[in-house]
Amino acid sequence: DVDVGDWVLAIGSPYRLNFSVTAGIISAKARSVPGQGTSYIPFLQSDVAINPGNSGGPLFNLDGEVIGINAMIYSNRGGYMGISFTIPINYAQEIIDQLREDGFVKRGWLGVSVQEVTKDLADSFGLDVPRGALIGSVLTDSPAESSGLKDGDVIVDFDGNEIIYSGDLPMVVGRISPGEEVKATVYRD
């Protein structure tokens, strides 16, 4: 299990400097990468220095266990700025297994655009705190439309996973096999 504040190590070959080790801490869990659109992966965010040549390398905890695969940095100037993103190892393993078995990655798809639930919206839905994913639009011929979801619905649980932020929904949906039926808890005004 990975917790915010855990020390981590990355091994890679930044700029062809083989077997380089950098250290840092886990800054956040279940992050979407800013500016990358919909994310199906709840990235680990850390301050481990990741540069060209580190992507695809392992991120270790201090027990020597691989906890993720280093994927990318967030930068407005192209170089490391202290924000790195790592694919959690359980997600990486699922992707590897699907690639070995099928040759491609299968992701569930709901067919909605979502936004955060504000305090005012939470009050109008009778939610004790702002949480969930507010459906802004439902695509035609999508699983969401087929299941009866509508613009303005708020999804607070999907397949037994609590949806706190709107970005949680695609991460949960993406792990479900296409065509699989699931239960959701939805508030409708």
Locate each region found by the language model.
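Conserved catalytic motifs of ABC-family nucleotide-binding domains
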Residues: G152
